[in-house]
Regions:
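Adenine nucleotide-associated cytosolic modules
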Residues: 1-536
Length: 536
């Protein structure tokens, strides 16, 4: 009884987010262990936004002690913490946000950990990195790339924010697309649906039954009549044909005894649904591309569960599905009496379950072939894929090593964007120049007030070096160089809070396997409240 009460309280606590990613998404988040490297203002804001939703555990790796500068920009450090280990101080205060979350800290620099315990970071679900020098960042990124652990790099620098997501192969079965067409199969009704629609004689219905007939029935009957009139088995393709179908539906509105044609909401819904519900049942291009991927075509003992399921889905489409994906088993809201709506809904659900079982059988056959246990992939996994097969996506990211390699860098994208005066790419280039400056002088430009003018000249030189490596001439952006030096690498809390929250969104996407992560670089300009993403 106590356990049930605890679960009920937990559901109430996380109710709003469970509506977004479901109980299974919440369970995935609660099983995640996130590492934060360096408890900067941006880093702790990112942790805050994943601790509040209930991430399972977090660990802060930081070898620094708290300074007055830290306290001035970081809400999760106070004056009593000055001189204490920053990892410990931040962990203790962050843990107060949510007693359900486990917190830990390591008082060690990431450089030291990478040198003496290089596999340490491979044990986390996601790693968030802040305030790392370029050399350390690239070393960490390479190890995480090889280990298959996602890395989220975030940074706030004056009025500018930056997020870089490094993830190798990341399948997303629940993408939650904004605009989804109904999956009613009206162009190819399955036997149970056809029998249900044919069993309803609209002429013999009472007025009440007539005005409460689900629009799916009205639409399919009208489509049958339209196809018969036109000698075709296809769907209406152009506006003229769709208008003709709408006219057919409107003519079916019953004229009452007083000879007045009263509005019937279900018929109005049928007219509106011509565009939304009368769509061809096809396999989307993105899903076809996954079917033709070498990882899908060649299943081995090393294949990941996602690819085994995709191969089973491909085989289903080519066989039982007759060229179509599994039925989703959902039905939109509509004007209808309860009895017929429930019957119709159960028909779709039964057909969806039949398709799930067909795909699951194929999954089991594949697992048996490659010598994997049956529970390697559960029926629930297959059901989730079948329900979302129309929108499944695979993210294949680029490594930081490729981005920083002059031969593999997306130079064309960068230089083309630089030609646009409104593009935020200039700040990405300046971040690269700032890191080059730090590597040369062991401090950030503008950090010391008395060296500001000298640093401006030095940063211009660093910027020129970066551009030269990309085969570009100098860029006349002196005002931006001055601005970066004026920042002096300071973290403004308002910017850090925004960037940290955005980084937390990406961590949650990765941990839950839902929603498509950004690809792959995000720049935020707080001066103009503008942001832009780039694939770098």
């Amino acid at each position: 009884m106590k356990s049930q009460t605890a679960e009920s309280e937990k559901s109430k606590k996380y109710d709003r987010q469970i509506r977004l990613w479901g109980e299974h998404g919440q369970a995935a988040l609660e099983s995640a262990h996130v590492c934060l490297i360096n408890a900067t203002a941006t880093g702790t804001e990112a942790l805050k936004s994943i601790i509040l939703p209930g991430v399972g555990a977090f660990t802060i790796v930081d070898g620094n002690t708290v300074t007055g500068e830290d306290v001035g920009s970081n809400f999760f450090l106070d004056s009593a913490s000055i001189g204490k280990p920053r990892a410990q101080a931040a962990t203790l205060l962050l843990m107060e946000l949510n007693p359900d979350v486990q917190g830990d800290f390591v008082e060690e620099t990431p450089e030291n950990l990478l040198e003496h315990n290089p596999g340490y970071f491979s044990n986390f679900t996601v790693v968030i990195a802040t305030a790392l020098q370029e050399k350390t960042l690239l070393t960490l990124a390479a190890k995480l790339w090889d280990a298959g652990v996602p890395l989220v790099v975030c940074r706030s620098y004056g009025f500018i924010g930056y997020i870089r997501l490094q993830v190798g192969e990341h399948p997303v079965m629940e993408t939650h697309p904004d605009n989804v067409l109904d999956d009613l199969r009206l162009d190819r009704p399955f036997p149970a649906l056809r029998a249900f629609v044919d069993s309803i004689n609209m002429e013999t219905l009472t007025d009440k039954e007539h005005s409460h007939t689900p629009y799916v029935v009205i639409l399919l009957k009208a489509l049958d009549e339209w196809q018969q009139q036109n000698g075709s088995q296809t769907l209406p393709k152009n506006s003229r044909e769709k208008d003709a179908l709408r006219d057919l539906i409107r003519k079916k509105v019953r004229v009452k005894e007083n000879r007045a044609s009263e509005p019937e909401e279900n018929f109005e819904e049928a007219v509106k649904a011509v565009n939304r519900s009368l769509n061809a049942t096809v396999v989307p291009r993105e899903v076809k591309e996954l079917f033709e991927d070498e990882a899908c075509l060649t299943i081995t003992a090393e294949s990941k569960p996602f690819w085994v399921m995709m191969r089973a889905l491909k085989d289903f489409v080519e066989n039982e599905g007759d060229g179509a994906l599994p039925v989703r088993g959902t039905l939109p809201d509509m004007t209808s009496d309860t009895d017929r709506y429930v019957k119709l809904l159960n028909l779709y659900r039964a057909e969806a379950e039949k398709d799930v079982q067909a795909v699951y059988r194929r999954v089991q056959q594949l697992l048996n072939t490659i010598g994997k246990p049956e529970d390697f992939i559960t029926e629930a996994d297959v059901k989730l894929l079948c329900k979302n097969a129309h929108a499944v996506r695979l993210v294949r990211g680029r490594s930081l090593a490729a981005e920083y390699d002059a031969k593999e860098a997306q130079v064309h994208t960068i230089l083309t964007s630089l030609d646009s005066p409104d593009s935020e790419i200039i700040f990405y280039v300046l971040f690269r120049a700032v890191d080059r400056f730090y590597n040369q002088y062991n401090c950030y430009p503008g950090y010391f007030d008395d060296q500001l003018e000298t640093d401006i000249s030095k940063l211009k030189a660093s910027l020129g070096q970066v551009l030269q490596e990309w085969g570009s001439g100098p860029v006349a952006r002196d005002d931006y160089v001055h601005e970066m030096c004026r920042y002096g690498a300071a973290e403004l809390h308002a910017v850090a809070a925004f960037v940290g929250a955005c980084a937390a969104h990406e961590v949650i996407k990765l941990a839950t396997g839902q929603y498509v992560p950004l690809s792959n670089t995000f720049i935020y300009n707080a001066m103009t409240a503008a942001s832009e993403t780039f694939l770098l």
